[in-house]
Amino acid sequence: MKARRNKKQIPSFRKLIKTSKVKPENKLKNKQFKQQSTLKKYRKEQRKLRQAVKDAVSKKPIPLENPKEKRPGKRIEREEEEEEEALPLDMMDEDDLQLMKDLGQRASFLTRDLSSSEPVHAKKRKHKRIIDKYEKIPRTLQTVPEKELIHLLPIKDKSGIIPQTREKPVTDSNKDEEDQEEERELEEEIIEDPIQELTIEEHLIERKKKLQEKKMHIAALASAILSDPESNIKKLKELRSMLMEQDPDVAVTVRKLVIVSLMELFKDITPSYKIRPLTEAEKSTKTRKETQKLREFEEGLVSQYKFYLENLEQMVKDWKQRKLKKSNVVSLKAYKGLAEVAVKSLCELLVALPHFNFHNNIIVLIVPLMNDMSKSISEMCCEAVKKLFKQDKLGQASLGVIKVISGFVKGRKYEVRPEMLKTFLCLRIKEVEVKKDTEDINKPKKFMTFKEKRKSLSRMQRKWKKAEEKLERELREAEASESTEKKLKLHTETLNIVFVTYFRILKKAQRSPLLPAVLEGLAKFAHLINVEFFDDLLVVLHTLIESGDLSYKESLHCVQTAFHILSGQGDVLNIDPMKFYTHLYKTLFKLHAGATNEGVEIVLQCLDVMLTKRRKQVSQQRALAFIKRLCTLALHVLPNSSIGILATTRILMHTFPKTDLLLDSESQGSGVFLPELDEPEYCNAQNTALWELHALRRHYHPIVQRFAVHLIAGAPSEGSGALKPELSRRSAAELFEAYSTAEMTFNPPVESSNPKIKGKVLQGDSFLNEDLNHLIKRYSSEVATESPLDFTKYLKTSLH
């Protein structure tokens, strides 16, 4: 017979997990329910006790026989009904009723000490009648002075608790009287000598005296630290503590002096390497005294430098949040001055200590301040970042700043100051890593054959050579020499972040005020852009120009960027840039003719890239049209702009020799010159002449006159019509800067209009002209004779 099969199914693992979860939940609920019930009971008991105390304190005793009169309410009535139902009065004896009445009249349970809100059975020790104790003590009069007692710990006996006391030792009354008299005298002296109010002059003298003392103290601490930094590193803490100066008369000035002093000290005593924290193994090992002293100096320097930076950060935060300290030593207006000094110190440390600890923390503090509402602070931070970019040879510090700026611009959704992106123009990036072929990257290692080894070096020599190479490599690492590969890698990463920022703005914020800075940056670094992006970038630039939303300066930057791309690696691309030539030709007459002639410099750069460097791709007709329009433009701009434009015209006439037909007034061609047409290829510039040069020859600026005469002569390199070397050897952009009137100076200086004539002093009625002087003297010396005047003969002759 077969064994009976168990019909119960084995529970699955999921079901087991489910049940195991339910049990703890039920336990937790039960536990919480118990806690709640105990709390409810405790609160109910406390409520009853408090009510009993109130009833005991009240004047009218509340009889407990009539509970209905005590508290009217449905709840009390229900309780009374329940009690009556539970114990009917018919079933009780008369003696029991009398006993209950007596107990109700006494209410002895209310005489307990119920001031503390504790349960009734909370303490084992029973409370005694406190009132009876005080009543049993006999009353005494105040004639005899009571002795002061000191209460000690009580002793517990069979009978109960026995309190222990001790008399307080009595001091001599004479001494007390003397002390009291001395105190009274001191109080009288203080009252008699009130604080005199100082006048303004006395207050200023007192402040000057305090300030001089603080200055001397700061100078003494700073000189001690500079003389021996390792021994006096603890004095840095003392000097830094003066940043919390509490004297309201000199607090602001002293804090500013301490900030600047500490900044200069850190610049002087900081080592030229980064200090790393010691490991546990290094701390446990025994070292020499010199090494231990150096370690203590480094630890102290890093900690004080860290606290100093935190103090500067807190000052800037307090000013930004308009916070006042509780002490109110520094006013809210003075916080701005303190914040400016703190920011200036941070900028100095950013530039001076790019290799030291916490440099990234300084960058994080400085970058948001570049976009500050205060123009002075924003310019200060931007100038510091530019200075850092210019002097950073390796590129490590520049990369850190670029990362923070890129993230900040993206986080603010491109609503930042354009000056932040203009700092990118100061980056020292000239080379980047170019993607190599896989064959070049994975070149097999070439080993020397036996014959090559025997011919070149012996075994011992090769061994020595390897040792020398290893030693040189270690020396390079120790001296932190600049590695070309590392430099290229850092520059490539930096430029990638810059281009990502630029392309984001071109894509998402085309109407942003950042666009001119982006286009200017693209124009500078266009030769380093990857060839893969050229087509898309040129399409975007042309779209921006055609949209008409750009100013003439922004559109010039677009043209400049496009031709920088095409003049570099873009030579390989088959792109016709005719639309960019047309746009530049059209924009020339839109240049500002007043003091803000910034666009002229961009035009000179564009002409150099578009016409001079691409001479083989430029037709003669296009060159003639540009020369004619440039000469017309030179008539209505400032002198330095005219000099730069005429210098560019001279270069174009040398680059395209056949353009000299514009100097010949008798030459003829087909068609009529159309000066207002915006197409340089079809304006028939060969049928005109450069008459503007004759007007420029009479210009008030002597250099403009020389250039005009030189171009009329055909721009010769030698002979009487040639220019001086200081003019011919300089580029158009250099001449534009050299003869600028931005500093309100005239180059060359203007000659005096009234020259002084030396050696001749006029005396009396003498004249400069000697003949006139002799004639006057002769007629004045002759004797005057009267002769009749007859004009009729002259009239007769004239009538005939």
UniProtKB/Swiss-Prot annotation:
Positions with biased composition (Basic and acidic residues): 66-78, 160-174
InterPro entries associated with the record: ARM-type_fold, CCAAT-binding_factor, Noc3_N, Nucleolar_cplx-assoc_3
Record-listed Phosphoserine modification sites: S787
Pfam families (UniProt xref): CBF, NOC3p
Cross-link Glycyl lysine isopeptide (Lys-Gly) (interchain with G-Cter in SUMO2) residue location(s): K333
Biased composition (Acidic residues): 79-93, 175-187
Keywords: Coiled coil, Isopeptide bond, Nucleus, Phosphoprotein, Ubl conjugation
Any one GO cellular component localisation term in the record: nuclear speck
Signal peptide feature range: none
Keyword Ribosomal protein carried by entry: no
GO biological process: DNA replication initiation
Record flagged with keyword Nucleus: yes
Top-rank taxon, per record: Eukaryota
Region (Disordered): 1-93, 160-187
GO molecular function, one term: chromatin binding
Compositional bias ranges of the Basic residues kind: 40-51
Intracellular or extracellular location(s): Nucleus, Nucleolus; Nucleus speckle
Main location: nucleus
SUPFAM superfamilies: ARM repeat
Coiled-coil spans in chain: 451-490
PANTHER family: NUCLEOLAR COMPLEX PROTEIN 3, NUCLEOLAR COMPLEX PROTEIN 3 HOMOLOG
Similarity remark: Belongs to the CBF/MAK21 family.
Function per UniProt: May be required for adipogenesis.
Protein name: Nucleolar complex protein 3 homolog
Source species: Pongo abelii
